[in-house]
A protein has these predicted regions:
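Generic beta-sheet signal
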Residues: 79, 107, 158-160
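Substrate-recognition "cap/lid" segment bordering the active-site pocket of phosphatases
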Residues: 84-137, 141-148
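Structural recognition of alpha->loop->beta junctions
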Residues: 96-108, 131-132, 168-191
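Acidic, Mg2+-coordinating phosphoryl-transfer loop and its flanking beta/alpha structural elements
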Residues: 135-177
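Hydrophobic anchor at the start of a short beta-strand
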Residues: 75-76, 101, 153-155
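Short, acidic loop-to-helix structural element flanking the phosphoryl-transfer center
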Residues: 49-77, 84-91
Length: 193
């Protein structure tokens, strides 16, 4: 979904900070909006409230491509770095956007979780690294290192303002401008050795 677009609106509402979406230069929103720790915490809390999460717009073409992959028999997971307590509204959002067949997992990718929670939909990085993937979609340069753990995993880097200047780790990472390009890359995901 278009999470960053909504975070720009929330930053404007909460702090009168006006950073247009196309000018969000860093995945780290504290840095993009020049927030102090207290402001950043308030922004993250507001951005992950159920009433906000449920209003995020779908990225055009995403649910169609993902459902096509599921229909073709591929095993698809949505793995997010969202806070563990945002699982329920995130799951509801996915269901409302016709992605009810796709499991959702929250992973503490960025070391933000302060308490151990043993919900079945949470996982540690170690648990994530024990999984196997041959394709991933990622937009966070900070998460590239996590995807690198999966041998022969082709990665579609969804082109966003905050990753446009990021150097891609290797030729398994391919920049894609939209979900049509992501789907084409998926169809041709075999990595030649």
């Amino acid at each position: 979904c278009e999470t960053a677009e909504y975070f720009t609106k929330i930053a404007k509402e909460l702090f009168d900070i006006d950073v247009p979406y196309r000018q969000v230069q860093f995945f780290n929103l504290q840095k993009s909006f020049d927030l102090n720790d207290e402001q950043y915490e308030a922004l993250m809390k507001a951005g992950h409230l159920p009433e906000n999460l449920l209003n995020y717009e779908e990225t055009p073409g995403a649910s169609e491509a993902i459902n096509k992959w599921v229909d073709q028999g591929h095993e698809v997971f949505i793995i997010t770095g969202r806070p563990f307590n945002s699982y329920e509204p995130s799951r509801q959002w996915l269901d409302e956007h016709h992605l009810e067949r796709v499991p959702l997992f929250c992973v503490d990718k960025y070391g933000r979780e302060t308490a151990k929670q043993d919900y079945r939909y949470n996982m540690t990085l170690a648990e994530l690294y024990n999984m196997t993937f041959d394709f991933a979609v990622e937009d966070s340069p900070a998460a590239f290192e996590h995807v690198m753990h999966f041998d022969n995993c082709r990665t579609a880097v969804f082109d966003r303002p905050w990753n446009s200047r990021a150097e891609l780790p290797n030729d398994r990472f391919v920049r894609c401008k939209d979900w049509q390009e992501i789907d084409r890359l998926f169809e041709n995901r075999e990595i030649t050795k």
